[in-house]
Amino acid sequence: MSSDEDKCSLHVAHNDSDRSVSTDLQEEYEELLRYAVVNPNVESGVSRPSHLRGEAVPDRFPVLGSNPLRETALEVGKGSDLNISSLSKSGSPRKPPHPVMDFFGPHFLGDSSSPASISTRTDAHEIIVGDHLVSEENFQKLENVLDIWSSGLKTNILSELSKWRLNFIDWHRMEMKKEREKHAVTVKQLSSQIADLKELQKAFEISIGRKDEVISSLSRAIGKQKERIELMKSFFRWRIGHVKSRQESYEGKLADQYFERTLLKKVWKGWRSVVQRQWKDVVERACQARAEEVCVQISNDYEAKLAMLSLALENAKAEIQRMHQEKDHFEDSMKKAFMRGVCALNLEAMTIFQNKNDAGIDFTNNKKEESGPGGPGREPSAHLDTSSSTMPSAVPLQLLPSATLAAGVASATAIPSTASLTSAGATSASSGHVPISVLSAGSAATAAPEDTFAPRVVTAAQQKAGKTITARITGRCDFGSKTRINSSLAIMGVSPPMSSVVVEKHHPVTVQTIPQATAAKYPRAIHPESGFPASRSVGARPAHAQSLSNVQSIKVVD
């Protein structure tokens, strides 16, 4: 980049100098034209082609004809041209010739001095001179102008040459600087290459040293291997001889053993032929004695085991008998507790329902009318009252509304005839409290939404001994509602797991289940003021509800 810039600067300087020289020459040429006295007609015809060729000054000089000043000017032009060419060759041989030097070059002078040009010019001068002649004053002025012009040309040429010289020196300095930079770069590259080659030489020397070490180690290993091979050869030779000696000794031992075995076989055959006659009897007697001993030992063991098992059997029988006694005692106590609970519940039911029969029936009928035959199944609650006094033992059944109003009315009116079971000749006040729970599931298609399970209370008072009372009770159950058990417990305590109850008719002994005894011992509190309605809501799936009927029997035994 720097070299290109320098070249551009040099070209610009040369162009400026050429422009200055050409402008000076143009001005001087115009000055000469002012002092030339020529014919306008002839000069116009001669000067026009000269202007077209760019050689106006030499064409105007033949106007002077055979004037000695013209010859001197031509000689001065030739000398200056020679001086300029010699200086240009010595100063800057590489530079192209200047247009001014081309203007004053020898070829131009040669052309101007050629015979054809001289003849044409002489003809023109003869015509011009024949018409007008130039005065001395004009020649003197022309001489002065030419002197001034030659001196200016000389100074311009010398200044231009000095400029070229300085430019050449600058260009030479720049080239030297570039060459020095290139030389420095090449020297640096060569030094780096020399350093790399030195490092490579060191690496090669190290690798050669390692190779020498490897070669020496391999030679030592080969020598050791040769020694080892020689030792192995000698060892195997000795081992082969040793194995052969051992083989010979082993073969001798085998021959001796074979000889001894053949002798033993012969002796054993002779002994067997002699002893074979008696060994069977001896072995049979020994086996028989051993079998007898084993049988005696086994029989003793079995007798001991039999005695132990018989003792264990007796103990088990005694334990079973004791457990039977405990069971009987427990059953007796449970019977007594059951009877006490039945009596207590019977008395409580008698006091509650003595004066409330008509009120309870009216209450259930009113509830049935309010709910309607097609309404959702919400059962009326049982109104219990504990403030009533104890009256004769006539216990009504707690009734629930059936699927229709007629069925509810019929069941309500049938209380005195079917639900109250009394015996006329009995003076005992014992009663049987039998709640019934229907646990079987029926068809969901025939169940009504309002049908729910209703426990029934049957009271037997003053019954005769040995009399069996059979009561047909119809109940409705709803397995979907979970409040059914709570409402049944609110009335009677618990739901019994059996469908028939055996009652022994004697006062101190009662039969009842454990849950019934617990319910009798801890009865639920019933508030007569609020009526405590034991309502049961219908379950989420009323399809499980079904109307069922069971036949329950109560047997009274003396």
UniProtKB/Swiss-Prot annotation:
Keyword Phosphoprotein: yes
Post-translational modifications: Hyperphosphorylated during recruitment to procentrioles in G2/M phase.
UniProtKB keywords: Acetylation, Cell cycle, Coiled coil, Cytoplasm, Cytoskeleton, Phosphoprotein, Repeat
UniProt-annotated stretches for the region Disordered: 1-25, 360-393
GO process annotations (BP): centriole elongation; eye photoreceptor cell development; negative regulation of centriole elongation
Parts forming coiled coils: 174-199, 299-337
Centrin-binding (CBR) repeat boundaries on the chain: 125-156, 214-245, 246-278
Residue numbers carrying N6-acetyllysine: K521
UniProt modified residues of type Phosphothreonine: T23
Amino acid composition bias (Basic and acidic residues), ranges on this chain: 1-21
Subcellular location: Cytoplasm, Cytoskeleton, Microtubule organizing center, Centrosome; Cytoplasm, Cytoskeleton, Microtubule organizing center, Centrosome, Centriole
Broad class of the protein's primary localization: cytoplasm
Modification sites for Phosphoserine: S80, S92, S547
Gene Ontology cellular component terms for the protein in this record: centriole; centrosome; cytoplasm; photoreceptor connecting cilium
Segments passing through the bilayer: none
Annotated function: Essential for the assembly of the distal half of centrioles, required for centriole elongation. Acts as a negative regulator of centriole elongation.
Similarity comment: Belongs to the POC5 family.
Assembly and interaction partners: Interacts with CETN2 and CETN3. Forms a microtubule-associated complex with POC1B, CETN2 and FAM161A. Interacts with CCDC15.
PANTHER family: CENTROSOMAL PROTEIN POC5
Protein name: Centrosomal protein POC5
Organism: Rattus norvegicus
UniProt lineage: Eukaryota, Metazoa, Chordata, Craniata, Vertebrata
Gene designation: Poc5
